[in-house]
């Protein structure tokens, strides 16, 4: 077991462990092996380690170095999962250091950040510190963020640092998102019987036009001072069963990127406004909406003490857009 405090060697170890998210690639390795590695590493360096695994095979690790008391607590947060190994040029699990850069699956997003947090936390924990230090290394960031949600049901802190790749910019705000499936309902019929059929795909075109108009409206709307305006787009469309029939339904998957003040409820209201306006002039227009994943936007004030301290420490101003 390598318990190195050398960030380059630690990063090599992390890259070499397959941790592809099985929600993205069915049957993929997931996080168990890499969770075992970081648990042993933190235990060796004197941390108390808690393994959270409400979904079997999807563990998140929280390593804790208790403070002496009277100080503020700090949580480091990062994810252990990666996207697919497919399509990688070379062996994705064989890290290569070339011209001062490390190459391997997950290096950028975000095993380099994980290694940096582990080393930093161990360094602080080895010295007197009044506040608790927590390192939350979570499962399933690449799909549903379930790992961080599970951690936050058990732990909190006065401040948190997430070492996602930001090109070393300090990011104090981030957009959220809301996913919806909008299904337009028609009536199936043989292609020779237009009198019996209602073409769901043709009627879905009206919704797509309304969605495009909303996208342009959002682009013109004054937005968040850091994040700018939200946006919306149709991501996936499915409909029909065969070329010789009128389609009974057409489903459009929609993603809405939100800024503070926006939520799944406000997005659903926007979609229903478009759909109801179509129905008002077309009595045959029928639809249903199914909500999907939602992640709320966030914004930390630049005058927040932790924000100011981070900017002073790095001699950087917060990123102007994220």
Specify the residue positions occupied by each region the protein language model found:
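Metal-dependent amide/peptide-bond hydrolase catalytic core
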Residues: 1-2, 181-322
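Acidic/histidine-rich catalytic neighborhood of metal-dependent amide-processing enzymes
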Residues: 110-179
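Glycine/serine-rich anion-binding loops at beta->alpha junctions
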Residues: 100-116, 190
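Predominant activation on well-ordered alpha-helical scaffold segments within soluble catalytic domains
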Residues: 12, 39, 115-122, 149-152, ...
């Amino acid at each position: 077991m390598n318990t190195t405090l050398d960030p380059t060697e630690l990063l090599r170890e992390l890259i070499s462990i397959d941790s592809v998210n099985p929600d993205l690639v069915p049957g993929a390795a997931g996080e168990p092996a890499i969770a075992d590695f970081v648990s042993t590493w933190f235990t060796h360096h004197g941390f108390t380690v808690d393994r959270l695994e409400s979904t079997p095979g999807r563990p998140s690790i929280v390593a804790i170095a208790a403070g002496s008391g009277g100080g503020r607590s700090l949580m480091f947060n990062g994810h252990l999962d990666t996207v697919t190994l497919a399509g990688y040029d070379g062996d994705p699990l064989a890290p290569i250091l070339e011209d001062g850069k490390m190459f391997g699956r997950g290096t950028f997003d975000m095993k380099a950040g994980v290694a940096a947090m582990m080393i930093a936390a161990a360094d602080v924990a080895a010295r007197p510190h009044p506040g608790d230090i927590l390192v939350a290394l979570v499962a399933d960031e690449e799909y549903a963020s379930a790992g961080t949600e599970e951690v936050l049901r058990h732990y909190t802190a006065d401040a948190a640092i997430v070492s996602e790749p930001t090109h070393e910019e300090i990011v104090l705000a981030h957009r959220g998102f809301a996913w919806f499936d909008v299904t337009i309902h028609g009536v199936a019929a043989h292609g020779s019987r237009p009198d019996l059929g209602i073409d769901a795909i043709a009627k879905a075109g009206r919704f797509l036009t309304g969605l495009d108009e909303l996208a342009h409206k959002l682009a013109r709307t004054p937005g968040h001072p850091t994040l700018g305006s939200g946006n919306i787009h149709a991501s996936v469309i499915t409909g029909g069963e065969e070329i010789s029939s009128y389609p009974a339904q057409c489903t459009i998957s929609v993603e809405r990127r939100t800024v503070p003040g926006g939520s799944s409820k406000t997005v659903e209201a926007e979609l229903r406004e478009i759909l109801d306006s179509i129905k008002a002039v077309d009595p045959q227009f029928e639809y249903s909406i199914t909500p999907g994943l939602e992640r709320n936007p966030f914004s930390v004030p630049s005058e927040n003490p932790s924000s100011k301290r981070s900017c002073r420490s790095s001699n950087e101003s917060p990123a102007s857009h994220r």
